[in-house]
């Protein structure tokens, strides 16, 4: 079986880990700061669990993608869904 070149595991795992950690940190910070909740503890929990969800979504998407193009489409779709969910959540406040 010939070896496949390109987006192999040597690059996939570090990129998926770095990207998911960076996105989880940024989304957790933005959720904690921007959610229209009265209780600070509720905002903290929402930010933590939101960051965990975003990080896991991007990590799994990065590890299961067949190539860089596939990963870009998955990332764009997941960010679109996340943005829509945050927009709907902010509209309730």
UniProtKB/Swiss-Prot annotation:
Keywords from the UniProt entry: Cell membrane, Membrane, Signal, Transmembrane, Transmembrane helix
Residues in the signal sequence: 1-25
Membrane topology: Multi-pass membrane protein
Superkingdom of this protein's organism: Bacteria
Record's keyword annotation contains rRNA-binding: no
Ranges that cross the membrane: 44-64, 71-91
Cellular compartments annotated: Cell membrane
Cellular-component GO terms for this entry: plasma membrane
Keyword Transmembrane helix: yes
Stated role: May play some role in transport of Fe(3+)-pyochelin.
Protein name in the entry: Protein FptB
Gene designation: fptB
